[in-house]
């Protein structure tokens, strides 16, 4: 459990967390993911790794596919209302990410459910009851809502319902601990209050740092196009990891590898104080990530490929060469189609 505690950005309340761990009972660890995009990024993978760690400690992972909440749109960190996604688009994304997630998590001690199974069936009276669990003043305690309200920026009532629905998910699955990115802390804490409202023992909120994207500034997101897909080729994953700013790689070491934090600190010290080339340390990071997602052999091959093509500027071994008849007018789309590149 030390691995998770060392990496968590918040554990709230800590005393209740410690009591749960001491109880030795099998805990229900909730993680909700909204299938709003077709891919699983390293950002998602970081928190999915944390969920798997709980499984390895003998606890039950409860993975909620937010097929209902994805229609509402998570307002966390947003300065304006999110565009609503069509149901069929959400279903398509869900079918795409589910097998990837299943490959990350252990098959034992795993429950995967969709929140549309209960949220879509709530009656009007039940929605009114849920809404009565929280006040407008509580909602405006959220920094993003508060900022938008102060600037007279529109906030739809639908957005207020998102954290209510997320909290109700905790009621539905009887969560003992809910984990998520640090931007979810307010939502997770509201989940505690909603569980209390329904006369349940409140969950503990446990958040982890948000992984920064390849641009080195914004959180990794498919909407920002600064992400690394875990289903990308080993060569591409390795190359993209090598492209991240040096100062960002420590977050990647912390959230995406099993290295001890003291060992990571030593790497950082060697660069800052002893003049060690950060390039060499980042190569290790790339190998560790690719090795976990694929294999040690694939990681070595990706490193060699990066060295040959990116550093030494050699021609790739799998480079395809096509002959074009110069007497004909060149029509690029046709050439690509004929050679199976489209």
Listing of model-derived features with the role each one plays in the protein:
Residues 75-91:
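A charged helix-plus-loop insertion that forms the helical arch/lid used to bind
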Residues 11-74, 179-185, 191:
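N-terminal catalytic cores of NTP/NDP-binding nucleotidyl/phosphoryl-transfer enzymes
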Residues 194-342:
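Conserved nucleotide- and phosphate/pyrophosphate-binding catalytic cores
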Residues 78-83, 128-132, 224:
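Short, hinge-like loop/turn segments at secondary-structure boundaries
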Residues 72-77, 123-125:
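Short, conserved acidic/polar surface loops in the N-terminal third of protein domains
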Residues 1-11:
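N-terminal regions that are enriched for targeting/export leaders
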Residues 24-32, 61, 162-172, 278-281:
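Short, hydrophobic/aliphatic alpha-helical segments
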Residues 8, 86-208, 216:
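Divalent-metal (Mg2+/Mn2+/Ca2+)-assisted nucleotide/phosphate chemistry catalytic cores
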């Amino acid at each position: 459990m030390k691995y998770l505690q060392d990496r968590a950005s918040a554990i709230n309340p800590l005393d209740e967390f410690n009591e749960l761990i001491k109880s030795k009972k099998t805990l229900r660890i909730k993680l909700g993911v909204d299938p709003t995009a077709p891919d699983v990024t390293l950002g998602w993978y970081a928190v999915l790794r944390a969920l798997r760690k709980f499984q390895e400690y003998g606890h039950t992972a409860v993975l909620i596919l937010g097929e209902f909440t994805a229609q509402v749109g998570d307002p966390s960190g947003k300065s304006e209302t999110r565009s609503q996604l069509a149901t069929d688009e959400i279903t398509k994304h869900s079918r795409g990410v589910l097998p990837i997630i299943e490959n990350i998590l252990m098959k034992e001690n795993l429950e995967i459910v969709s929140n549309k199974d209960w949220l879509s069936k709530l009656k009007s009276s039940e929605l009114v009851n849920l809404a009565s669990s929280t006040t407008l003043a509580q909602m405006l305690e959220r920094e993003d809502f508060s900022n938008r309200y102060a600037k007279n920026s529109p906030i739809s009532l639908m957005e207020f319902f998102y954290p209510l629905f997320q909290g109700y998910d905790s009621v539905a699955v009887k969560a003992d601990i809910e984990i998520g990115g640090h931007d979810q802390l307010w939502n997770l804490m509201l989940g505690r209050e909603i569980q209390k409202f329904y006369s349940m023992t409140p969950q503990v909120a446990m958040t982890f740092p948000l992984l920064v994207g390849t641009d080195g500034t914004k959180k990794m997101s498919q909407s920002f196009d600064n992400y690394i897909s875990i289903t990308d080729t080993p060569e591409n994953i390795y190359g993209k990891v090598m492209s991240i700013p040096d100062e960002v790689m420590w977050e990647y070491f912390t959230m995406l590898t099993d290295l001890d934090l003291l060992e990571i600190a030593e790497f950082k010290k060697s660069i800052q104080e002893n003049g060690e080339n950060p390039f060499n340390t980042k190569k290790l990071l790339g190998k560790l990530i690719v090795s976990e997602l694929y294999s040690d052999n694939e990681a070595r091959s990706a490193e060699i490929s990066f060295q040959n093509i990116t550093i030494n500027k050699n021609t790739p071994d799998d480079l395809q060469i096509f002959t074009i008849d110069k007497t004909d007018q060149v029509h690029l789309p046709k050439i690509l189609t004929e050679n199976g590149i489209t």
